[in-house]
Amino acid sequence: MYFPNDCFVSMLTGVDGDRSSEVGLIGSEGMVGLPVALGIGVSPFRAVVQGGGTALRMKIVDFRREFSESVALKRELFLFTHLLMIQIAQTAACNRFHTVTQRMARWLLMTRDRV
């Protein structure tokens, strides 16, 4: 598990072998490694650091132990999961219906929110 402090990480999904598309952007509001932390063996996403900086790292076994014992951590994880699903849905709609200029503006605003 990685917890970005002052960097941001793109979540990419593979398309047609070697191509990919960004489906999410994670900054200090979230964590990288959510599927694995939830017990899913492999994440369907590839994480790429887009804006350099620092992040905290936690072993999955330690995260799962804390998750099983902490109501507050569960609440935060569920909230983050919900917000990430909203972001993924918004990204899909934007990629389908917006112009390149609008998509770039959205991406710039999202990166600004995360630094």
Whereabouts are the PLM-identified features?
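Polybasic "coupling" helices that flank or enter modular domains
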Residues: 51-52, 67-115
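A generic structural signal for short hydrophobic patches within well-formed alpha-helices
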Residues: 31, 63-64
